[in-house]
């Protein structure tokens, strides 16, 4: 059998031709003289049909019956080489199918644990290494890949340089209570929460930089939106205003959505994602509302029949129900800007004339997906940053390199970060973030 293989996703290019596919058997059915094979190869799914008389005619009765019997007894996830003629077939949901005329078993699969029936979440997570093979899980990972590809493409086209920040650090970029600590040759070190502080150094050297890699948060959270290890894209840029930063973030998110539509249309179809709704998010401008305006809106509507959130006062932080209501109220991704400084990071620049608010923004995704981006302008004045650190009782010695950036040619600069898994969850339309990463790490899960 020829081993010059064709990927399933490329099969439509070979209608009327004989091809060979390397694939796994996702499912099979049929009876008597006919067998149907549901095949997958990582690029897509496809159906093959085998007719017993065709095998007898091609190979003779003994060998033909033996090969057809092999097909009839294939078990789920057996790997095979399968050869046949690609034929158009309107009855097939693919629009074409493979008329199988030869098969070779590569690797047998016995008692595959994830069968086509329903399974509980814990069972599926315990078998995550196998669950990834299922149709929907494959589709989610294909969307993840499309979003990552679009990330690199967007930043390349917008003049950014990939800048690799360290994973081990002696300081905290965000909340020091959420750090994973390790021993670094006798010195305490921490797994990175964000590459931002180092990226600011990159922005002072290279103008526009971004990084993409794993970050770690020791949050004891069990929500559907939190992981302890996830992949973060951080970007930093010099000489940009706050409004220009929001423009850039909006363009980036729209590029990611478009990237998924362009590169993973079959995946979106498998997940039954409303592509017209995604296109609406691209076509319409994102809404921008201040934190205080958002609080006023929440208070004005808190007694409406369809609301389900707790009362908030000015100065309170939003919970997930508040974020959901705000983004659904506007119907498009919504920037909430200028939060209170009291619950934002030390490095954020105050709003001119209003030191109790900072020049920051969270982008809230509609449909209940909540925050997907956090960004801000950074405090670029040395004395102001030192005063803020002293106010918070921070150890300046751990941030000398960061303060140096304000001593030697400081400029207005800002940046933002996006957890790729949250973006994948939003674009894919899935309900839980654990499916947006190949092997999720959560409060009580570190295997497989």
From Swiss-Prot:
Highest taxon listed in the record's lineage: Bacteria
Molecular function as annotated in GO: asparagine-tRNA ligase activity; ATP binding; catalytic activity, acting on a protein; nucleic acid binding; transferase activity
Top EC group: ligase
Reactions catalysed according to its record: tRNA(Asn) + L-asparagine + ATP = L-asparaginyl-tRNA(Asn) + AMP + diphosphate + H(+)
Gene3D superfamilies per record: Bira Bifunctional Protein, Domain 2, Nucleic acid-binding proteins
First-listed, main subcellular location of the protein, grouped into a coarse class: cytoplasm
One GO CC annotation: cytoplasm
Record localization: Cytoplasm
GO aspect biological process, one term: asparaginyl-tRNA aminoacylation
Pfam families: tRNA-synt_2 (PF00152), tRNA_anti-codon (PF01336)
Keyword annotations: Aminoacyl-tRNA synthetase, ATP-binding, Cytoplasm, Ligase, Nucleotide-binding, Protein biosynthesis
Enzyme Commission number(s) of this protein: 6.1.1.22
Family statement: Belongs to the class-II aminoacyl-tRNA synthetase family.
Assembly notes: Homodimer.
PANTHER family in alphabetical order: ASPARAGINE--TRNA LIGASE, MITOCHONDRIAL-RELATED, ASPARTYL/LYSYL-TRNA SYNTHETASE
Name listed for the protein in its UniProt record: Asparagine--tRNA ligase
